[in-house]
Curated annotation (Swiss-Prot):
InterPro entries: aa-tRNA-synth_II, aa-tRNA-synth_II/BPL/LPL, Phe-tRNA-synth_IIc_asu, Phe-tRNA_ligase_II_N, Phe_tRNA_ligase_alpha1_bac, Phenylalanyl-tRNA_Synthase, tRNA-bd_arm
Protein's recorded name: Phenylalanine--tRNA ligase alpha subunit
GO cellular component terms given for this protein: cytoplasm
PANTHER family named among the record's database cross-references: PHENYLALANINE--TRNA LIGASE, MITOCHONDRIAL (PTHR11538:SF41), PHENYLALANYL-TRNA SYNTHETASE (PTHR11538)
Cofactor(s) the protein needs: Mg(2+)
Source organism of this protein record: Mycolicibacterium vanbaalenii (strain DSM 7251 / JCM 13017 / BCRC 16820 / KCTC 9966 / NRRL B-24157 / PYR-1) (Mycobacterium vanbaalenii)
Membrane recorded as keyword: no
GO MF annotation terms: ATP binding; magnesium ion binding; phenylalanine-tRNA ligase activity; tRNA binding
HAMAP family: Phe_tRNA_synth_alpha1
Annotated Mg(2+) binding sites: 265
Keyword tags: Aminoacyl-tRNA synthetase, ATP-binding, Cytoplasm, Ligase, Magnesium, Metal-binding, Nucleotide-binding, Protein biosynthesis
Length: 347
């Protein structure tokens, strides 16, 4: 059956545009508008068929008919574009209403925690010594007795080696312990680095202490070691005075009291002037220090006739207690975020 000829008259094209405009205007959703577009602007729409029929016209009529078809398509397309913009605006307005945030509602955000003050103090100590030209050094927390005791001049019968003071690692005879101080880093540094050496080590240490107001079985130490030609106790004193002022302010002062440590000779206890001491200011024990024992230097292959050195060690928990007036060390280890919040450093 032969196809019906397409009507290309002005009236037929006007009817096609009018039908398309009505269909677009009646579409209430974007899906309905898409269907109307297919029907009135698609490949089988009246306007598309009119364009296809241009080829069957005489050449003398094609130009005029083509202009009229293009005008019709432009008008229909304009109707579609206007309705599309209107429906999209309606959709966006509905989304804004549905997803709007009620700023008057109480917040459901979890409160921000705070970094632990020991972490903050450790970074502050590291910054202090790095600013003086020192380097950072680290060592393992599970240490051999060779580095924890032997190389530091502890005699075989020293009480610190016993299970009453030190955590020994199974099996028996492994000669491994949880390090009781950060001093093993001294030996490792002297064996691994070329002289001169100026290093600071900050880390956890372990002892079989009961947890109470002034002791904890896991605590943090800062250990300093300097080995160079011509170092004396005066250099040690100047270094610790600078350290004290950095932590306690201009009022920070130190004094030395003679003491004994296996790995330093001469040795001293370091006291810090504690202006916040209950009952008034006074001297409080801060840590230990001294000149590196020649036996320790020899164990690391260093000639003590050529090089000398000094070392010192302080507990970070003890330093925090003095500096911030914290009466009970247990607050530092119980994990209550309320303890950290007053220090004012967000996570």
């Amino acid at each position: 059956m032969a196809e019906q000829p397409v009507d290309l008259s002005d009236e037929a094209l006007a009817q096609a545009v009018s039908a398309a405009s009505r269909a677009f205007d009646q579409a209430s959703t974007l899906d309905e508008l898409a269907k109307a577009k297919t029907e009135h602007l698609g490949d089988r729409s009246p306007i598309a068929l009119a364009r296809q029929a241009l080829g069957s016209l005489p050449k003398t009529d094609r130009a005029d008919a083509g202009k009229r078809v293009n005008v019709a398509r432009t008008q229909a397309q304009a109707g579609y574009d206007d309705r599309l913009a209107a429906l999209r605006a309606e959709r966006d307005a509905e989304v804004l209403v549905a997803e709007r945030i009620d700023v008057t509602l109480p917040s459901t955000r979890q409160p921000v925690g705070a970094r632990h003050p020991i972490t903050i103090l450790a970074e502050n100590v590291a910054d202090t010594f790095v600013a003086m030209g020192w380097e950072l050094a680290e060592g393992p927390e599970v240490e051999t007795e060779q580095f924890n005791f032997d190389a530091l001049n502890f005699p075989p019968d020293h009480p610190a080696r016993s299970e009453q003071d030190t955590f020994h690692i199974a099996p028996d005879g492994s000669r491994q312990v949880l390090r009781t101080h950060t001093s093993p880093v001294q030996v490792r540094t002297l064996l691994e680095r070329e002289l001169p050496v100026y290093v600071i080590s900050i880390g956890r240490t372990f002892r079989t202490d009961e947890l109470d107001a002034t002791h904890t079985p896991v605590f943090h130490q800062v250990e300093g070691l300097a080995v160079d030609k011509g170092l004396t106790m005066a250099h040690l004193r100047g270094t610790l005075d600078a350290f004290a002022r950095a932590q306690f302010g201009p009022q920070g002062r130190t004094r030395f009291r003679p003491h004994f440590f296996p790995f330093t000779e001469p040795s001293a206890e370091v006291d810090i002037w504690f202006p916040n001491k209950k009952g008034g200011p006074g001297w409080v024990e801060w840590g230990g220090c001294g000149m590196v024992n020649p036996n320790v230097l020899r164990a690391c292959g260093i000639d003590p006739e050529v090089y000398s050195g000094f070392a010192f060690g302080m507990g970070l928990e003890r330093t925090l207690q003095f500096r911030n007036g914290i009466p009970d060390m247990r607050d530092m280890v119980e994990g209550d975020v309320r303890f950290s919040l007053p220090f004012g450093v967000g996570a």
